[in-house]
């Protein structure tokens, strides 16, 4: 699935926000300090999340990234592989972000086939949620800009 939206912040600001929240997630998940350079070069970590009264291990990979242009994240669980990226561009004085994601199940089960079918039916609602998330992110960025 791919969605392109106009954003009213600079691509550099949106990219920095994505890196900041990723760095915070790495710190929370691993208690390790990482830098933007670590993300640009590519970084891998594991996080543990609650899942159905148990814990699930998610293998996360970010990057390599192209600063202010391209942000990519992959994650993998025992059942699923997911890839998503943000591609930033400017045209005619306007800024755009293209968000794309791919989800793949590792096993070909009836439940996974039904999940894929359901996702196709829900695609319109999912695109709407993605647009809303992009809008909320730009609002957050504008409201938290550093005073210059």
Regions found by a protein language model. Give the residues of each.
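Hydrophobic pocket/interface hotspot
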Residues: 14-18, 24, 62, 73, ...
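Beta-strand elements of well-folded, non-transmembrane domains
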Residues: 7-11, 51-53, 64-66, 79, ...
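Glycine-rich portal/gate segments that line the openings of hydrophobic small-molecule binding cavities
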Residues: 32-79, 132, 136-147
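Hydrophobic ligand-binding cavity/cleft-lining segments
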Residues: 1-41
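Beta-strand/loop substructures that line and gate deep hydrophobic ligand-binding cavities in soluble
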Residues: 76-132
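Intrinsic-disorder/low-complexity, polar/charged segments enriched in Ser/Thr/Lys/Arg/Asp/Glu/Gln
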Residues: 1-6, 57, 70, 83, ...
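Extracytoplasmic electrostatic interaction patches
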Residues: 13, 44, 48, 63-66, ...
